[in-house]
């Protein structure tokens, strides 16, 4: 019977499954897996190489070594399949069963599983509520544990040392049980009543008040409940039977010379078997306790080492002094099972070779070497040869191919025709790193690549290699052609702009072609059409740059798709009219009629794609490339040393700078400036000198004087080769030319500080030894940085992909009414990013109204295309609420409307698009372009720090935002609020400029007044912070007592005396509680109230503030009462580049974060402690006050009696995203993270669409903490998926809604907190994740991409999405049928059925 079952088991291999569950294996389950017990440590016989019986490679247990042949050779061949040989006991079957049949070892004494013991938090420890140290002492036979206290004073689980045990024995005899080792722990676990324990803890939870105890109890409840729910038994954490891995998964290979190469696991298993057998023998002999104990301890250690070597104590090493690789090491880390074999496999039908340029290829083609193609397409060739009758058998075909007969090459051509291949360049940082091409057979051994796809691959031809993969099945070929073909990937998924853009030679060629020159041959001609222009150029009658008039025919495409032709005579050049011949119909001539640089060419392709669509764009791109190459060759551009022109002014500029530096040096020596100021000033002088030299140099290079036809001097843009290359954007930049022809400038030391002696020479003049030595620092640092950067950037991408991998578009519309408000990004006086770029391709969340009227311009749920954006710009809208992924209400996915446009395709995103992975790639791919450094503020940066006024750049109207202000006696506005900002808007109400206004700034214009450009609108003292009165009256001193709370000082230079308030730390004794303040009173001595409130005007003076008023002085509103010097807030380093992006996505709390107001109310200060101030916020509605202790050195932005709103900044500093989420909500934190990340990328000139960052933010916000679970299955304080709470809340009445607070998790935490344990385990901390999941019997729904890749099926995205949807429907159907069939049988029917069955059975008997 068993054999029959076994046979059925082997045949029925394909198992359809929907979920995967991980749990603890009971001893019975382990025995059911096993095909026999392993009793001996032997492996194979060294002479015969046959496996030993009952050993680790036993053929009787694991199966035959040769296919269909038993070990002794009695039964051979297929006809005996399934027979079990009576001589050697081996079943005759395939040898591959040795990969799947397991064995087992019956342990003589139970041993604890190290994962559940040592993986923190220790599961056994938590369950037993015993410290880990105590459990370890019991397990490793150092102490006893009481398993049953009986009627004695001993408690269960009490730890006894050897002496205490003997004493207890004397005292109580055998009234109690105490044991040591894993048996003891196993017994305690077995006797636990989980349900009862759980109820007791829950009762205790209600009674307890201590926070730490509460946390611990909650953890225990969760663990015990997961045991109850999953059906795992606690005693299974102690092993009594050890499963043994199939032998072919831990191979033993004979090497020549009689030695063996073996897997480390065999050593580890051998140790366990040896010790186990010895222990059995000792127990049979009834050996002394101490010996048995030692043997048991050694067995426990051997099992530990097998499961996870090195987790406890020293790792066991092999003969080569290296730690042995245990089972845990097999699955974790980069070389482990998950990352090495499941997520990244090597594939068949692939090859790699060096790439060279294929300038004659079309965009969808690549050159494939014949040798390579022959090898890759072998099976296809064999098939074709057989079908066409050239070969009778496959073997013959094989021979023909080996001989490389001529017919083979013809067949190869046929096979390859329209069969796309995929080219991949490592590192594949985004999806454009693999694209499909049609192969063209070429001679040679290098793959030829189309130059325009180099940008997407980030490839160059300096020895890069690429891999070729052949899609085999029809579906694969179809997908390669429809989705991956290079012609279908013209736009970048990161920002929606063309990625197929010409660079280098092509750009230079087009630039040269479209330049004009005065006084060229053929200037002033009138030509009938571009064809004639080309003819004249070819025959040498006119030059390429000659200014001529040409009759041009333009074709315009109207709204109704009709094409209108218009003919004009246009001033242009010969070159531009030749270029016009390749521009597709439908584009305006103005696109070509200018000097074309890299930006304008990209713009031209973009316009072409939006107006004409894919096909014309692809052909246009190819034509641009051919033309560009051709004219770059004709231009004969090359760089010579004479092209590097050094400006004449250079020496003078440097002399002046040296003179200024010597002046500063003198000032320093006479003590007028400090060392730091001197250093900063010197660096500033040199930096500006460098700028001046660069300006002079560029002026010199970029303009040449020429004499025109009338004999007059004229200036025109220069034809200097170096300038042309930089100006066109082909290669090089102003900064590089500056090093060639200007001066190299300031260099940095290895620690990042700037060396104050600059390199005044350039490369044309050459450097002297010292200058050369200084410049080596920078060069080396650059190389070291690059290596670091690549690793860090790769790790960031990996974390991003992991956190977002399961986010897929799953429905069309989630019908949400929420969204986020978009405004243009304005910093200071310039628009960094206009609104159209931020909202293009998004869906409108609520109707956009025409300002001032109530007509709807754009209706809700409209996808904003280029046309709509132009319309919005025309109507001067500068604020739109758009749908966003963050506010999308789809559970386990996102809806298409909230995501908007698929950037790489230009239409609304399709269902099944893996937007999470695309977002992660878009953010991670440019990571290598970011800097690694933290900026130390010095020199140039310190000048920016102290702005003291605002000078506007545009004409417009002044608008103050959330500004409280008073008007002083000079009729100026004085700002008295913290977050005031000032906007300049144009006559249509669009924001042109935006500035922050500090407290105490004087504003020269009132709200709504007009202002002209260049006017100074506001000014303030950047070095002090004033305290300003909002009322007029007379001053009365309170608690201002000389030498107790204040001191009087006189300024040495001016002779003016002033009062300085002492800090609390400087006061003595009783004076510490005095609170110096200024009260404002009227003539009658009564309090004056703050405007609009009933709070008396009283201003408290913080320590170190300076007063220049006397008691009783008359003051007016807007006057300064006291000043605080701001010099104390030291300069902090700014983290920039990659580390900053990583910090934001990991949601790290800054070191000294800004302190925000937790509630709205009035500020006051309570009793101080030694180093801290007590800040009290009293709500206006009279509910509970909020208190917070703030360190004294923190500079506070608020004064006593001031009113703050929830989330206002109380003390400056970098804001913590967690605080923003808690106090200002999801929208604010989204906006914060998006803007901060964009700032870093914008600095490097990298464009990424906001929605990608929003996708990652959505994943960071996917968890929430339950505040009160009401009647639901959730515990208070439990962290769970936000979508689960949303589902629960949608299904309950409004009174029973669950209260929760959203959590912001960093991307690493969020990846590990995913519901899928397979995904989490393959990411990081494999052991911990698997331990946790096994205990709670987790079920993996296989929702994400990663899990499905690991179990080896189609991913639920893209073309695999429909397959998974189908399976889901089938599953639902099955479930409903199952339910209905269960429900339809009544009780009578059931009893009837039973009677019938019994009758039938009786009759049979």
UniProtKB/Swiss-Prot annotation:
GO terms for molecular function: DNA binding; DNA-directed RNA polymerase activity; magnesium ion binding; zinc ion binding. InterPro entries: DNA-dir_RpoC_beta_prime (IPR045867), DNA-dir_RpoC_beta_prime_bact (IPR012754), RNA_pol_asu (IPR000722), RNA_pol_N (IPR006592), RNA_pol_Rpb1_1 (IPR007080), RNA_pol_Rpb1_3 (IPR007066), RNA_pol_Rpb1_3_sf (IPR042102), RNA_pol_Rpb1_4 (IPR007083). The gene is rpoC. SMART domains: RPOLA_N. Its cofactor is Mg(2+); Zn(2+). NCBIfam families: rpoC_TIGR. Zn(2+) 2 binds at residues 814, 888, 895, 898. GO terms for cellular component: DNA-directed RNA polymerase complex. HAMAP family: RNApol_bact_RpoC. Belongs to the RNA polymerase beta' chain family. The keyword Nucleotidyltransferase applies. Binds 1 Mg(2+) ion per subunit. Zn(2+) 1 binds at residues 70, 72, 85, 88. DNA-dependent RNA polymerase catalyzes the transcription of DNA into RNA using the four ribonucleoside triphosphates as substrates. GO terms for biological process: DNA-templated transcription. PANTHER family: DNA-DIRECTED RNA POLYMERASE, DNA-DIRECTED RNA POLYMERASE SUBUNIT BETA. Mg(2+) binds at residues 460, 462, 464. The keyword Transcription applies. It catalyses: RNA(n) + a ribonucleoside 5'-triphosphate = RNA(n+1) + diphosphate. This is DNA-directed RNA polymerase subunit beta'. The RNAP catalytic core consists of 2 alpha, 1 beta, 1 beta' and 1 omega subunit. When a sigma factor is associated with the core the holoenzyme is formed, which can initiate transcription. Keywords: DNA-directed RNA polymerase, Magnesium, Metal-binding, Nucleotidyltransferase, Transcription, Transferase, Zinc. Its EC number is 2.7.7.6.
């Amino acid at each position: 019977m068993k054999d029959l079952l076994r046979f059925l088991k082997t045949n029925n291999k394909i198992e359809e499954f929907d979920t995967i569950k991980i749990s603890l294996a009971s001893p019975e389950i382990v025995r059911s897996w096993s095909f026999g017990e392993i009793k001996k440590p032997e492996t194979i016989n060294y002479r015969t190489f046959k496996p030993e019986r009952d050993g680790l490679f036993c053929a009787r247990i694991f199966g035959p070594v040769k296919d269909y042949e038993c070990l002794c050779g009695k039964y051979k061949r297929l006809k005996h399949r399934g027979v079990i040989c009576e001589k050697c006991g081996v079943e005759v079957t395939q040898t591959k069963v040795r990969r799947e049949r397991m064995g087992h070892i019956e342990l003589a004494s139970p041993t604890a599983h190290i994962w559940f013991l040592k993986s923190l938090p220790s599961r056994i420890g938590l369950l037993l509520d015993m410290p880990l140290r105590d459990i370890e002492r019991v397990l490793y036979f150092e102490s006893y544990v009481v398993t049953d206290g009986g009627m004695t004073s001993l408690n269960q689980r009490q730890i006894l040392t050897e002496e205490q045990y003997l004493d207890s024995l004397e005292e109580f005899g055998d009234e109690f049980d105490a044991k040591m080792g894993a048996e003891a722990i196993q017994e305690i676990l077995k006797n636990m009543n989980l349900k009862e324990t759980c109820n007791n803890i829950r009762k205790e939870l209600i009674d307890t008040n201590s926070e730490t105890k509460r946390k611990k109890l909650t953890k225990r409840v969760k663990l015990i409940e997961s045991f109850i729910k999953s059906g795992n038994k606690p005693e299974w954490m102690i092993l009594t039977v050890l499963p043994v891995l199939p032998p072919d998964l831990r191979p033993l290979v004979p090497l020549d010379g009689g030695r063996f190469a073996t897997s480390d696991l065999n050593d580890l298993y051998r140790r366990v078997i040896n010790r186990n057998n010895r222990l059995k023998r000792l127990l049979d002999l009834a050996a002394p306790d101490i010996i048995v104990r030692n043997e048991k301890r050694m067995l426990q250690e051997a099992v530990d080492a097998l499961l996870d070597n090195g987790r406890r104590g020293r790792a066991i090493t092999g003969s080569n002094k290296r730690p042995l690789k245990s089972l845990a090491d097999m699955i974790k880390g980069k070389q482990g099972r998950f990352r090495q074999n499941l997520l990244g496999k090597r594939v068949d039908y692939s090859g790699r070779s060096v790439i060279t340029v294929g300038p004659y290829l079309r965009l969808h083609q690549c050159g494939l070497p014949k040798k390579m193609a022959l090898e890759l397409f072998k099976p296809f060739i064999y098939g074709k040869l057989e079908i066409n009758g050239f070969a009778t058998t496959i073997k013959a075909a094989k021979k023909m191919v080996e001989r490389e007969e001529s017919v083979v090459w013809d067949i190869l051509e046929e096979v390859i025709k329209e069969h796309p291949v995929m080219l991949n360049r490592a590192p594949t940082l985004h999806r454009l790193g693999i694209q499909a091409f049609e192969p063209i057979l070429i001679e040679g051994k290098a793959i030829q690549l189309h130059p325009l796809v180099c940008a997407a691959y980030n490839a160059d031809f300096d020895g890069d290699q690429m891999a070729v993969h052949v899609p085999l099945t029809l579906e694969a070929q179809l997908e390669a052609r429809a989705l991956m073909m290079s012609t279908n990937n013209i736009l970048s998924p990161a920002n929606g702009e063309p990625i197929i853009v010409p660079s280098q030679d092509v750009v230079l060629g087009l630039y040269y072609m479209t330049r004009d020159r005065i006084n060229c041959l053929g200037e002033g001609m009138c030509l009938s059409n571009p064809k004639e222009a080309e003819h004249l150029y070819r025959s040498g009658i006119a030059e390429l740059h000659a200014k001529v008039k040409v009759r041009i025919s333009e074709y315009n495409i109207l709204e109704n798709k009709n094409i209108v032709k218009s003919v004009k005579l246009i001033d242009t050049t010969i070159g531009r009219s030749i270029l016009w011949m390749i521009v597709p119909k439908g584009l305006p001539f103005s696109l070509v009629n200018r000097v074309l640089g890299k930006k304008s060419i990209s713009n031209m392709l973009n316009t072409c794609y939006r107006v004409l669509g894919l096909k014309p764009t692809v052909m246009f791109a190819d034509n641009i490339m051919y033309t560009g190459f051709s004219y770059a060759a004709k231009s004969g551009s090359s760089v010579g040393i004479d092209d590097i022109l050094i400006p004449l002014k250079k020496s003078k500029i440097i002399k002046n700078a040296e003179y200024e530096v010597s002046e500063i040096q003198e000032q320093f020596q006479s003590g007028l400036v400090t060392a730091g100021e001197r250093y900063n000033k010197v660096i500033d002088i040199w930096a500006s000198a460098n700028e001046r030299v660069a300006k002079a140099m560029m002026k010199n290079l970029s303009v040449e004087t020429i004499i025109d036809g009338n004999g007059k001097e004229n200036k025109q843009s220069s034809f200097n080769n170096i300038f042309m290359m930089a100006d066109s954007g082909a290669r090089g930049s102003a900064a590089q030319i500056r090093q060639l022809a200007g001066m190299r400038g300031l260099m940095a030391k290895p620690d990042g500080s700037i060396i104050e002696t600059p390199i005044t020479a350039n490369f044309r003049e050459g450097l002297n030894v010292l200058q050369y030595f200084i410049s080596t620092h920078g060069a080396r640092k650059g190389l070291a940085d690059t290596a670091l950067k690549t690793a860090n950037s790769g790790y960031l991408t990996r974390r991003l992909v992991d956190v977002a991998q399961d986010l897929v578009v799953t429905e069309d519309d989630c019908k949400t009414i929420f969204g986020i408000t978009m405004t243009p990004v304005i910093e200071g006086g310039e628009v960094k990013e206009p609104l159209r770029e931020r909202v293009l391709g998004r869906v409108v969340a609520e109707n956009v109204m025409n300002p001032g009227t109530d007509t709807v311009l754009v209706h809700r749920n409209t996808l904003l295309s280029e046309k709509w954006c132009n319309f919005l710009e025309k109507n001067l809208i500068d604020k739109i609420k758009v749908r966003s992924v963050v506010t999308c209400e789809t559970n386990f996915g996102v809806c298409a409307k909230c995501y908007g446009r698929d950037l790489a395709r230009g239409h609304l995103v399709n269902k099944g698009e893996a937007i999470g992975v695309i977002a992660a790639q878009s953010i991670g791919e440019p990571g290598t372009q970011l800097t690694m450094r933290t900026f130390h503020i010095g020199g140039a940066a310190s000048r920016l720090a102290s702005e003291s006024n605002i000078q506007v750049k545009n004409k417009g109207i002044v608008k103050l935002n959330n500004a409280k202000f008073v008007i002083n006696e000079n009729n100026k506005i004085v700002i008295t609020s913290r977050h005031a900002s000032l906007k300049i808007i144009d006559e249509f109400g669009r924001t042109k400029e935006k500035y922050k206004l500090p407290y105490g700034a004087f504003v020269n214009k009132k709200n709504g007044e007009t202002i002209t450009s260049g006017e100074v609108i506001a000014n303030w003292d950047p070095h002090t912070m004033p305290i300003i009165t909002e009322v007029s009256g007379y001053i009365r001193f309170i608690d201002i007592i000389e030498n107790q709370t204040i001191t009087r000082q006189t300024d040495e230079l001016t002779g003016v005396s002033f009062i300085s308030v002492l800090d609390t730390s400087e006061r003595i004794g009783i004076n510490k509680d005095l609170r110096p303040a200024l009260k404002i009173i009227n003539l009658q001595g009564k309090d004056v109230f703050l405007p609009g409130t009933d709070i008396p005007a009283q201003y408290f003076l913080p320590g170190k503030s300076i007063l220049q008023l006397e008691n009783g002085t008359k003051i007016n509103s807007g006057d300064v009462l006291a000043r605080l010097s701001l010099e104390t807030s030291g300069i902090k380093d700014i983290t920039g580049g990659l580390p900053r992006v990583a910090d934001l996505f990991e949601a790290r709390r800054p070191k000294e974060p800004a302190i925000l107001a937790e509630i709205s109310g009035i500020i006051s200060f309570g009793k101080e402690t030694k180093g801290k101030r007590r800040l009290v916020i009293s709500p206006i509605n009279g509910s509970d006050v909020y208190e917070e202790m703030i360190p004294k050195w923190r500079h506070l932005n608020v004064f006593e009696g001031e009113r703050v709103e929830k989330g206002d900044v109380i003390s400056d500093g970098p804001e913590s995203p967690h605080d923003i989420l808690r106090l200002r909500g999801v929208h604010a934190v989204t906006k914060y993270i998006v803007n901060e990340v964009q700032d870093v990328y914008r600095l490097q000139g990298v464009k990424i669409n906001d929605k990608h960052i929003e996708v990652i933010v959505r994943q960071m916000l996917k968890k929430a903490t339950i505040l009160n679970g009401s009647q639901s299955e959730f515990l208070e304080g439990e962290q769970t998926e936000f979508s689960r709470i949303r589902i629960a809340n949608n299904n309950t009445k409004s009174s029973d809604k669950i209260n929760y607070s959203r959590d912001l998790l960093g991307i690493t935490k969020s990846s590990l907190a995913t519901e899928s344990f397979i995904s989490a385990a393959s990411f990081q901390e494999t052991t911990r994740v698997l331990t946790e999941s096994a205990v709670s019997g987790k079920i993996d729904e296989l929702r994400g991409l990663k899990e499905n890749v690991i179990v080896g099926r189609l991913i639920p995205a893209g073309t695999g999405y429909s397959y998974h949807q189908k399976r889901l429907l089938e599953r639902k159907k099955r479930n409903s049928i199952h339910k209905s069939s269960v429900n339809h049988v009544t009780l009578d029917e059931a009893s009837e059925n039973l009677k019938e069955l019994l009758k039938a059975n009786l009759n049979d008997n």
